[in-house]
Amino acid sequence: MGRTLAEKVWDEHVVRSTPGEPDLLYIDLHLIHEVTSPQAFDGLRLAGRTVRRPDLTLATEDHNVPTLDWDKPIADPVSKTQVDTLRRNAAEFGVRLHPLGDVEQGIVHVVGPQLGLTQPGMTIVCGDSHTSTHGAFGAIAFGIGTSEVEHVLATQTLPQAKPKTMAVTVEGSLPDGVTAKDLVLTLIAHTGTGGGQGYIVEYRGPAIEELSMEGRMTVCNMSIEWGAKAGLIAPDQTTFDYIEGRPEAPKGADWDAAVAHWKTLVTDADATFDKEIVLDASTMTPFVTWGTNPGQGVPLGGSVPDPAQYDDPSDRIAAEKACEYMGLEAGTPMRDIKVDTVFIGSCTNGRIEDLRAAAEIIKGRQVDKSTRLLVVPGSVRVRLQAQDEGLDVIFKEAGGEWRGAGCSMCLGMNPDTLQPGERSASTSNRNFEGRQGKGGRTHLVSVPVAAATAIRGTLSSPADLEPVGSN
């Protein structure tokens, strides 16, 4: 009987399998950062253990780091302690670290792929829920807890119960102006935030195959937002072209051998999934969230829903609470919602393709006078490339802020936060209460919607903008 892509990758990494117990998986790449690693290293120290495979471990500073004045001491004492602790632990245990000021520093899920460390067929873990990003390369990648971080550091293995498999087939092609972010937000609204629970999801179909690697990473990044254990996409020529020539990619004969193996990483024709979902990309439009979880979303052309329309009492109560927290009334057109801050960045949409798309829309225009635009590249390499292309000048001339690399406003763990009651249009992945700062109100959007919103000051798409030079 045939196997799915996920089953092939999983089976290749089983070190031990005992009936009634979780499989013991070998881990090919372990990514760590300053927030979820300190206790794990303490555990190693207390037990007198070393890091078993420091060569398969990569650390970077991203969650707590400032995106301004990164060359100065970190002001927040908690953030400074976590960053300093990571540096000491990396030095003591021989782990490769890319700290602030290093040309390879950045968000861990941006750095791994851009270095070529993320490759098809791998198992990849990190103490971060958006590790699923790396599944875009045909890898099984998922977030783990701090105790599991310690286990991987000590043994390079991890006990895991084998999840079920699901196929999400996206037929057709995305219309112009509709992005991978709109696709995945549409999917989450369709399934709910628990629709993928217990599954490794394979995204497939014509619309997925047409996506760039950056777009595929956006889709896989948000797998956890609808409850999936992991999300992955079969590698193809787009994947190989992205990896080839990167610093950690195979070279010469090793490259040829790697590609030959990677081409086998596809779901067999006679394989079966435990569940299948089919969507039509051609019907999709720009999509935005209105509530306080990623599943509470509607097309940009829609309105805030009436909580009374929900048949399920728990959904109705959740909608009522979301409207209250977000300061919205049912029936309000999404395009009428005023935004205070626009954030373009994060491990979801902070890559060079995202910045190019934003700059193309913003060029020759001015940010709305009552709106702040914050553009944060996902890594130093992305920042330098954007500057080489003059993208930073476009953002600054429009009245936006051009920052250093880091997680920034995706989460309220660094200086880039919303104030209570402040409303954002954000290209990040979570819109929970307080996610971007206590009392902050977050609308998840695509890069084109974010850029257009910065210009108009209300939730908008590029189609809503006047032509450059028309005023």
UniProtKB/Swiss-Prot annotation:
Biological process, per Gene Ontology: L-leucine biosynthetic process
Involved pathway(s): Amino-acid biosynthesis; L-leucine biosynthesis; L-leucine from 3-methyl-2-oxobutanoate: step 2/4
Region annotation (Disordered) ranges: 417-443
Reaction(s) the record says it catalyses: (2R,3S)-3-isopropylmalate = (2S)-2-isopropylmalate
Cofactor(s) listed: [4Fe-4S] cluster
Enzyme class: lyase
N-terminal signal peptide: none
Its job: Catalyzes the isomerization between 2-isopropylmalate and 3-isopropylmalate, via the formation of 2-isopropylmaleate.
Protein name: 3-isopropylmalate dehydratase large subunit
Organism, scientific name: Nocardioides sp. (strain ATCC BAA-499 / JS614)
